[in-house]
Amino acid sequence: MSLFEDLINSKIRELEDLKRNLLVNIETNIRREADAALSKFSAQLANVESEATLERERIIYNAVVEARRKIAEVYDQMLKDLVNAVYEEVDKMRGAERYVKFLTSLLETAEKYVQTKDVVIYASPKDKGVVEAVARNLGLTGIVAEKDIRGGVVVTTRDGSITVDYSLESLIANKIEELKHLLYQMTYER
């Protein structure tokens, strides 16, 4: 072989080696870029999944909060309706023996608390006559005055130092938690 052929063959081998190395380098670069793109898209996908999960949780949380708010509104309305029903029932019972016994019991308890028979008794204008009769029967002295209450009585000593509020409004306010519990039981134990 001639020198010229040896040089050509040598250059051909170098070119073939370069071609092989070039293919390996190109393949390596393509893999590296593909891995980088895959990592980037995987991270973006993970972020999107995370955002979707957070959005789902936010939607569920908002729905739960809204449901609880509506339930609370319904309970409040039920409680108002129950209190109004009590007031209406008292209005129907005025003058009945059971209501007179109720007023008698309130006045007896108030007398024990204030420890005097000389008292000022405040009553609803609708109850004034009944309260005057019950007070006389119990031996209470003093006056019976009208007050803007729905029922029951407010008893105070003449000097005003002790007051016992047994108005229907006060009695209901003191029992409001029991009424809420009763409503809850009635709703969930059916």
UniProtKB/Swiss-Prot annotation:
Q: Give the GO molecular function terms.
A: ATP binding; proton-transporting ATP synthase activity, rotational mechanism; proton-transporting ATPase activity, rotational mechanism
Report quaternary structure and partners.
Has multiple subunits with at least A(3), B(3), C, D, E, F, H, I and proteolipid K(x).
**Which BP terms in the Gene Ontology apply to this protein?**
proton motive force-driven plasma membrane ATP synthesis
Keywords, A to Z, come to: ATP synthesis, Cell membrane, Hydrogen ion transport, Ion transport, Membrane, Transport
| One Pfam family, short name | vATP-synt_E
- Keyword Repeat recorded: no
Membrane topology field:
Peripheral membrane protein
What protein name does the entry list? A-type ATP synthase subunit E
Chief subcellular location: membrane
The UniProt entry, under InterPro entries, shows: ATPase_E_C (IPR038495), ATPase_V1_Esu (IPR002842)
Compartments where located: Cell membrane
Summarizing the function annotation, the protein's role is: Component of the A-type ATP synthase that produces ATP from ADP in the presence of a proton gradient across the membrane.
Q: List GO terms (cellular component aspect).
A: plasma membrane; proton-transporting two-sector ATPase complex, catalytic domain
Per the record, the similarity remark reads: Belongs to the V-ATPase E subunit family.
Keyword Nucleotide-binding in annotation: no
